[in-house]
Amino acid sequence: MEKFAFVHPLVVDDFARKFPIMRYLPDSWIEGAMKHVKSFKISHITGVRSPYAEAEGWFIACPLTARQMVTLPEEYVTGKIIEACQLAQDLGAKIVGLGAFTSIVGDAGITIAKNVDIAVTSGNSYTVATALQGTREAVRLMGKDLATA
C-alpha cells in the first residue's frame, strides 16, 4: 500500500472550532498560542483505490496561519514545516505534499526535503504537467500540430 501525507497551514477559525472558548479571543492572541503548538494529525485518509494500487494518507496541520508564514522569521517557519513533515515520516508516509503557503516559504521545499527522509513535493511539477496537458489538448481541439503551432 502506498502512503502519503499532506501538510497544510491552519486558520484561526480552525482553533476556534476545536476549542469554542477561543471564539471570544482576539485573532492575534490565538495566533500567538498557535506558534507554540506542535504539528498534529488532522485526519487519516483511507479507501483510496484504483485498479492498480491502494493508498492511505494523513492530513497534517502545520499550526501557523498563512499570515504567520509570511511574517514570522523564515527559519522559524521552515522549522515548523520540517516538524510537520517529520510527523508525516513517523506515520509512515513515503511522500509529503506541501500545501498552500507551506510550499512558498524559503526555497520552495528544498530545505524541507533535505531535513526529512521522504520525498517532498510542492505541487509545482503537477501544475506544470497539467498546464502542458491542457495546452496539448487545446492545440488538438483547434486542429493544429503542436510542433508547428
Which residues does each predicted region cover?
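N-terminal ligand-binding/catalytic initiation module
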Residues: 1-113
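Short, surface-exposed basic-aromatic patches at helix termini and helix-loop junctions that form
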Residues: 111-117, 139
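A glycine-rich, Thr/Ser-enriched phosphate-binding loop motif common to dinucleotide/cofactor-binding enzymes
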Residues: 118-137
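Glycine-rich phosphate/diphosphate-binding loop of Rossmann-like nucleotide-binding domains
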Residues: 137-149
